[in-house]
Every structure is written in structure tokens, then in C-alpha cells.
């Protein structure tokens, strides 16, 4: 190439998936990778700027949803009325209408209100928005970051990369969801893309969980069970045909249990049931 590769070069030349760099716990961003391994790379961000780039790299740059990426794009041009501008742009460019649940979820993502209490500390600096009358503007801390042209350049490249990934991999959603059939999602992705108000740790989901507010009911199945798991979680979930699955409820349930009734009467109750299947727990991408 004759120069330090840009993020787009990884997709253009297909040498490696740069998301593996983002997912690496000792790196977390392409910026951090360059600082660590590229002698000619001289840009140095502040600790807060570095954390913001890591957050966007790890949580948003895969392109699984366009909303946060286009929101960040708006913040490079405007300081106020961000949500209103975002809704208008999504409607015009993507024919995508943002309902109240989705708007609340996006705002929570961009104000560090979506994570569980323990996870909030990790990205405590990553509050991009602040409330302004009936809309949101750029937070003071994020506004300060945007005064650094080097930070802005890294941010814009990252956002453009995410938007490109969205268009290639995630723009053909299933029905009226934010999900694409046969793509891989983490538990956190599922909670976010189903527009839950808060994230849930996998332990609390425990195979499935009904969210009353959004009336969504994701079911998570490990198809191959490990030999060392307890008998109470050694469920005999299996496909009997390509469109027929036998899935077992959580232990201690009866036909009258609320979660069982929600599943059996999902259509009548207006509940959306989503099925996520992974081969086994060794699939780190779908963790």
C-alpha cells in the first residue's frame, strides 16, 4: 500500500477482519493498534478521547444498526437538535422511522444509561449527548473532544467504516426489526437491537427473557451442550425439521407459568419472539 492502511482498506483488500482488533481486550480500537505497533503513527489522543473511540469501535462500528452511527455523523456537523435531525435523516435516507422505544434505546446508548450498573464504569466518559429542552445536544465533554481535529478525523473514519459495514451486512432487516436473518449477534446486541431500555447480563437472561415494555421475547439456544453443565440446564433443545424446533423451558416451570403462557400465546398477546441459535459456547462472536 505504501501507507498506513485506512479502515476501509481492510474491507477493500480483505486481508483480515478489523473487527478482530476491536474485539481484542488489549487493543479495543484501530487507533490503539497503531499506537502499539506502528512506529510511524504519531497521533496521540487524550485518555477520554481514546475511550470514546474504543466505545464506538467495540459497540457500534460493526454496523449492526445505523442509528448511532448516523447520530455521530450529525454531531460532526451540528451541536444542537441532534435527535430531531437524526429522525429526519433516517426517514429521508433510509426510509426508517424511529419509534419511541428505539429513540429511548439510542439515547440510552449514547448517554451511558444502557449498560448494567457494573458495566457503566467501563465507559463512564462516553456520554455524547445532554438533554436540551425537547431534544438533545452534544455533551460538554464530547464537545471538548470535537475541538481536536485529529480526534474528529479518527471518529469520522470509524463512523464511515461502520456505515459501510451496515450497508453491506445489516441493511436488509427481517420484517420490521433491526435484525438480519443468519447474522451473528451477542446477547448485548440483541438487547440493544430489540430496543430494551437497559442491557441484561446473560446470566439474568438464562436462555430467554420477556421484555414487557417492548413486548419482545428473545430465546437463546446453545445447540451443542457441554458435558460439565448441571442437569437443570442440560435441556434437550433440538431441531426436528429445518422449521421445527423442540425447545425446553427453564427448570421449575409449568404450563401455567407466565413465561410459558407468553410464549404459547405470543401471537394473541402481540409478543414478538426471536430465536438466536449458536452451535455452542465456543462461538465467541455470539457470546
Protein language model regions, located:
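Long, largely alpha-helical accessory region at the distal end of helicase-like NTP-driven motors
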Residues: 2-86
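Acidic, glycine-rich low-complexity segments with interspersed aromatic residues
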Residues: 35, 47-56, 61, 65-66, ...
Amino acid at each position: 500500500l505504501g501507507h498506513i492502511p485506512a479502515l476501509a482498506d481492510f474491507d477493500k483488500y480483505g486481508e483480515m477482519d478489523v473487527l478482530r482488533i476491536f474485539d481484542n481486550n488489549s487493543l479495543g480500537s484501530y487507533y490503539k493498534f497503531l499506537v502499539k505497533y506502528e512506529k510511524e503513527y504519531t497521533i496521540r489522543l487524550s485518555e477520554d478521547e481514546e475511550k470514546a473511540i474504543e466505545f464506538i469501535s467495540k459497540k457500534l462500528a460493526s454496523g449492526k444498526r445505523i442509528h448511532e452511527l448516523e447520530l455521530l455523523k450529525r454531531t460532526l456537523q451540528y451541536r444542537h437538535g441532534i435527535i430531531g435531525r437524526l429522525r429526519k435523516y433516517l426517514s429521508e435516507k433510509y426510509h426508517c422511522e424511529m419509534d419511541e422505544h428505539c429513540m429511548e434505546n439510542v439515547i440510552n446508548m449514547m448517554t451511558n444509561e444502557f449498560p448494567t450498573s457494573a458495566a457503566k464504569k467501563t465507559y463512564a466518559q462516553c456520554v455524547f449527548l445532554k438533554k436540551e429542552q425537547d431534544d438533545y445536544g452534544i455533551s460538554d465533554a464530547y464537545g471538548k473532544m470535537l475541538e481536536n481535529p485529529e480526534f474528529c478525523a479518527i471518529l469520522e473514519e470509524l463512523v464511515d467504516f461502520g456505515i459501510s459495514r451496515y450497508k453491506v451486512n445489516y441493511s436488509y432487516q427481517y420484517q420490521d426489526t433491526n435484525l438480519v436473518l443468519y447474522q451473528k449477534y451477542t446477547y448485548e446486541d440483541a438487547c440493544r437491537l430489540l430496543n430494551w431500555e437497559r442491557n441484561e447480563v446473560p446470566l439474568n437472561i438464562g436462555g430467554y427473557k420477556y421484555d414487557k415494555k417492548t413486548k419482545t421475547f428473545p430465546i437463546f439456544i446453545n445447540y451443542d451442550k457441554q458435558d460439565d453443565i448441571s442437569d437443570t440446564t442440560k435441556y434437550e433443545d433440538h431441531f426436528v425439521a429445518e422449521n421445527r424446533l423442540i425447545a425446553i423451558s427453564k427448570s421449575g416451570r409449568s404450563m401455567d407459568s407466565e413465561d410459558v403462557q407468553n410464549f404459547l400465546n405470543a401471537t394473541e398477546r402481540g409478543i414478538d419472539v426471536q430465536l438466536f441459535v449458536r452451535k455452542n459456547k465456543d462461538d465467541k462472536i455470539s457470546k
